[in-house]
């Protein structure tokens, strides 16, 4: 008798579940329409996504394979408006490149938006509970401890930066030889990041054959291959991001192995920092013993000696420090290699600065060079390290513009809905940057000072990049020294000229899919 009743019980259960789900959908739809009318919202243009979003998913997948995600989104905005809605695997996502909306997401409505509920489980295997995966009070705690470590007083001396410049110059090939600058940019960025964060650079530019990405001090060489593991893990994290709630389907033993390699690399330094803090905090130590050069990790370990917390924060900061710098530095030479006029102008400015200051030029004076600043900012405008980002609504709310026929009415955003913002598209809008928006023209930065939310290469608001000042100084100094010692830089990129839309590989940050092939000639003397 009991067994015969099971089908009926199951049918009743599934019917009730379906009815409950239908009720929730109808109730949510009614509430959304009511609030939308109350808040004077208008519908946003829909991108043709297909059933369950299969067309949009396929288009983005194809764009990613071709390295054209940024240009594909840009085409979509040009055709359907600066704010649009698309469906991704059943989720309605609003995508915008409006400055007012980006300001709302990152600053003016900061408390209404946060990270996706999937961000932590998506990123946890590599980034743990670091500042890029946390939200709310956990994020506030991380930022409170990390922010003091990025003050101007902690910026290293020009001699520190020059030591890395010399290592990079030694790795450049003979005049006339074709080489890819992107791997060198990543090694330079890794060396400078580990030197600043851990107090000791791994010097991958100095000994690329013996232990390029490992730690020489460890006898078992467990950390060899760190950079490759870091790159692979980031690639998987990006795929988990695109999968939204289905992130758990993207996993593998190789992915888990790569995260262990990264963690062991960082834990080596964390353990040394904790040991260092315990020694200098012992009763017999004098203040003099606590002196020495600034070390980010040692300073952070003075605030907490929680091993997992320190490791997670260091992995997060290392990711941003290495990848952002390498991305921008590579893009600068992609642009300069294609523009001999811009190269000659920059070369003259650098040569004049060296002649005027002899060997005593300072970091501040390097940063004050207008054309160098223009070159850097144009690279950040055209190739932002993080071209696309997103936030999720904590509750039913709105974004300022994007609705209605003219796109100027508020748009209703329901609780849990994702709003993606494209910095790539924002930075290439002709109505903001002029008819030559998709042209590399450093002079525009001497003629035009854009409003704050028209130019956001490092995000903005409370979650703005903490290390942006360090990154700008490092990139400016490295470009200055390379231009100083090189007479010419020419593009040697194979294949058809892709202009300002070369194939780009998007993980958590952006890099050039095919690298940046150059041919150089050193300056005489």
Show which residues each predicted segment covers.
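Short, small-residue alpha-helix embedded
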Residues: 324-337, 478
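Conserved cytochrome P450 K-helix/beta-meander segment immediately N-terminal to the heme-binding cysteine loop
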Residues: 385, 407, 415, 421-448
């Amino acid at each position: 008798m009991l067994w015969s009743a099971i089908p009926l019980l199951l049918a009743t259960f599934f019917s009730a579940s379906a009815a409950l789900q239908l009720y929730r959908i109808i109730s949510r739809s009614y509430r959304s329409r009511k609030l939308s009318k109350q808040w004077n919202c208008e519908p946003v243009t829909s991108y043709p996504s297909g059933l369950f979003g299969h067309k949009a998913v396929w288009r983005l997948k194809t764009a990613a394979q071709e390295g054209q995600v940024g240009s594909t989104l840009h085409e979509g905005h040009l055709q359907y408006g600066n704010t649009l809605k698309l469906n991704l695997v059943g989720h309605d996502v609003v995508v915008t490149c409006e400055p007012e909306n980006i300001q709302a997401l990152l600053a003016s409505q900061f408390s209404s938006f946060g990270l996706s509920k999937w961000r932590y489980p998506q990123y946890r295997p590599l980034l743990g509970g670091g500042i890029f995966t946390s939200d709310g009070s956990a994020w506030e705690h991380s930022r409170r401890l990390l922010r003091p470590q990025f003050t101007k007083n902690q910026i290293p001396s020009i001699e520190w930066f020059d030591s890395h410049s010399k290592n990079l110059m030694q790795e450049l090939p003979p005049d006339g030889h074709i080489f890819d600058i992107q791997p060198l940019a990543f090694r330079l960025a890794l060396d400078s990041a580990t030197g600043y964060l851990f107090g000791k650079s791994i010097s991958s530019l100095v000994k690329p054959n013996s232990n390029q990405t490992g730690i020489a001090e460890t006898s078992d060489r467990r950390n060899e291959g760190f950079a490759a593991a870091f790159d692979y893990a980031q690639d998987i994290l990006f795929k988990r991001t695109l999968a939204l709630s289905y992130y758990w389907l993207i996993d593998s033993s190789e992915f888990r192995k790569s995260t262990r390699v990264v963690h062991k690399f960082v834990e080596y330094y964390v353990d040394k920092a904790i040991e260092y803090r315990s020694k200098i905090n012992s009763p017999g130590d004098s203040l003099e013993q606590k002196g020495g050069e600034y070390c980010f990790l040692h300073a952070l370990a003075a605030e907490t000696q929680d091993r997992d917390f320190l490791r997670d924060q260091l992995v997060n900061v290392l990711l941003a420090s290495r990848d952002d710098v390498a991305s921008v530095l590579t893009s600068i030479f992609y642009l300069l290699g294609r523009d001999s006029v811009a190269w000659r102008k920059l070369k003259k400015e650098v040569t004049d600065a060296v002649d005027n200051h002899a060997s005593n030029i300072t970091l501040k004076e390097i940063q004050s060079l207008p054309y160098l600043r223009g070159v850097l900012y144009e690279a950040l405008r055209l190739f932002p390290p993080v071209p696309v980002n997103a936030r999720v609504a904590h509750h039913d709310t709105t974004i300022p513009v994007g609705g209605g026929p003219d796109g100027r009415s508020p748009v209703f955003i329901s609780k849990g809905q994702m709003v993606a913002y494209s910095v790539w598209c924002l930075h290439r809008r002709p109505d903001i940057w002029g008819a030559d928006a998709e042209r590399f023209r450093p002079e525009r930065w001497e003629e035009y000072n854009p409003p704050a939310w028209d130019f956001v290469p490092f995000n903005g608001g409370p979650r703005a990049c903490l290390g942006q000042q360090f990154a700008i100084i490092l990139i400016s100094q490295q470009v200055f020294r390379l231009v100083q010692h090189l007479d010419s830089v020419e593009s040697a990129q194979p294949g058809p000229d892709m202009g300002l839309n070369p194939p780009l590989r998007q993980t958590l940050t952006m890099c050039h899919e095919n690298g940046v092939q150059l041919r150089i000639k050193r300056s005489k003397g």
